Amino acid sequence: DALENVKIQSGRITGVTDNDSEQTVTLSPALSTTSYSVMLTPVIPTGGIGTNAPIIGIKSGSKTITEFIISIQNNGTTPNIDEIEWLVIKP
């Protein structure tokens, strides 16, 4: 059955810093290929965020079978995004 072959991993990155940064997500166990989808959800602080919303995405060329890199740009200063939830689905 095809559904039995679907692999899902999830987690949360904490301690995202102000301004520009990169966070590496380690996949364990490793996936069989780099053909997987990543969903990122920034966790908004209780008081909201500043006037400039940060840009959050996957760093180009960073997806491997064991990791990928989240790039955070323009994160501003407090309050800012300090956590990101991630979900990986490999069909």
Model-predicted regions and their roles:
Residues 1-37, 42-48, 54-91:
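Extracellular receptor-binding modules and their adjoining Ser/Thr/Gly/Asp/Asn-rich linkers
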